Amino acid sequence: MKLKTPDEVPQKPGVYIMHNKEDEVIYVGKAKKLKSRLQSYFRDEDKLDRPKTQFLMRHFSYFEYILTNTEKEALILEANLIKKYRPHYNISLKDGKQYPYIKITNEDFPRIYITRNIVNDKASYYGPYTDSTHARAFIDFLNKNFQIRTCKHMDGPCLNYQIKQCSAPCVNYISQEEYNRNIRRVKLLLQGKYKTTIKKLKKDMNRYAKNMEFEKAAMLRDQIDTIKITLEKQNIQPNQDVNQDIIGFDHNNEEAAVVILSVRSGKTNKKDDLVLKGIKGFSDKQIRTEFIKQYYSTAPLPDEIILEDDIEDKDVIVEWLEEKANHKIKITVATDGHYITLIKIAKKNAHISLTENTKEEENPLLTLEKYLNLPRLPYHIEAFDISNISGIYAVASMVVFENGKPAKKMYRKFKMNTPGPNDFAMMKEVITRRYSHISPNNTNNTSDSLSIHPDLVLIDGGKGQLGMAVDVFKKLNITDVPLAGLAKKFEEVYLPGQTNPIILPRQSSALHLLQYVRDESHRFAITFHRKLRSKAFTKSILDDIPGVGKKRKQALLTHFESLDNIYNASFDEICQVKGINQKLAKTIYETLKEDKKE
């Protein structure tokens, strides 16, 4: 059921799914009391709790809800829906496709390999691994020491069997039971249960030795030695019987870096670096909570998760994780000196990771907000351009950028009513027509995209064009929409009330974004203008030529590929068009020639 208000929603646990007017899912949330939570969204914009909620409600069209029996069920459903839809306004763990997983297939004789896609195929997945080199090295170690097959089709013994790196299940040199016993050992290692693996290997080794199967016993002895050498080159931690994840966070306005120090069987076994996107407006507690929910929906679960500070809904999250792991799990805050030190190490690494990410990928919206001293992040930018030939077929374009990217479904085209070749007056007309649709009090809770108050309006031009837009806004009583003019000659940015322009650095991502917006508005206007011109050309010229019907007109367009090419074609070139004889070609050529003279 598509709902506009929460009046009919019950006070029960559940999940709500918000959509925009294009039916895209833009936010997924859960609540113990659905109605109360949803009511918090339907207030005046200045009373909404954070800027991101304001942006969300500007694009809101309707919502749906799903009731659950418990808050835990709501939590699980929310996590699954976020993973499915990846909504724009939810905090999101950087796309999991960028991180590799180790996959153990669901075959009679399973294989182990790297994948970046998790599918519902009953296979076992372990990860994500932020270091693909480490993951591949680990797979090589497992395949070699447990003699796991690597071939996709079991066609007979291969080189790996000859060099004792495969047990050759393809020709039954190993039973399915024995092979899958090795797979179970591999799974224990991937879960970080090294002591359990070694204990089981020793038990099997002693059994083989007792039965005088010395070759098999020696193989297990070598596996035990290799595991000890390979996986236990770590500093010993105080609690050697508990598997722990120690997690440190650092963040700026847009993203958070997360570092996980994984301690397995008392050894620091690996360090993972991950990124959370879309955190602007969320508290530190909310960021920690969203990370725990998203990361541990797929990652192996330790016995204890140690954080710098607490999370929301801890009891419900612990209950959910324990059900997934089938063992007790604790989420604790570091109080012991040793763990406080490890948290500091994780935070320091997160800070380094965040700094490197920021250097590599400057956020143009943040930079633009800073340089232009805007009141808010310019998430929604609108820009205009005029296209005409001496006032004929005059059109204007409006392009929209959201989050630094073209939002083409929101583009608009305008046919100009202003007479004569007056770009200045045409720009005034289109600005007036566009912004007469929005209300001065900034009520954006509607599905009409033209009612949205932009975060920045970009005018193509300098002081004069900008001043014209300022006058229009004054007449319309619009005071909360920032304006800027981009003068093309020196790429200077003009702001209302400022005499001197702002010169953005040539390599600035903010300048590149403004240029992209300006150029896109120009492209869109030119395309519309050419379409009108072409339509008028085909109607007034080709349709008036005797002998040129629909099929021959199409033949001309197919042959010459554009109307301009037809217009400039020679007599001989027109003769080459299929279905057009010399007599008709002469008529077409002379008609177009006369039209050019006019």
From Swiss-Prot:
Function, as annotated: The UvrABC repair system catalyzes the recognition and processing of DNA lesions. UvrC both incises the 5' and 3' sides of the lesion. The N-terminal half is responsible for the 3' incision and the C-terminal half is responsible for the 5' incision.
NCBIfam families registered for this protein in UniProt: PRK00558.1-5, uvrC
UniProt organism field: Methanosphaera stadtmanae (strain ATCC 43021 / DSM 3091 / JCM 11832 / MCB-3)
Subcellular location(s) of the protein: Cytoplasm
Protein name as annotated: UvrABC system protein C
Summary of subunit composition and partner proteins: Interacts with UvrB in an incision complex.
Matches recorded under CDD domains: GIY-YIG_UvrC_Cho
Keyword presence, DNA damage: yes
Pfam families cross-referenced by the UniProt entry: GIY-YIG (PF01541), HHH_5 (PF14520), UVR (PF02151), UvrC_RNaseH (PF22920), UvrC_RNaseH_dom (PF08459)
Domain named UVR: residues: 195-230
GO cellular component terms given for this protein: cytoplasm; excinuclease repair complex
Main location: cytoplasm
Residues covered by the GIY-YIG domain: 11-91
Top-rank lineage group of the source organism: Archaea
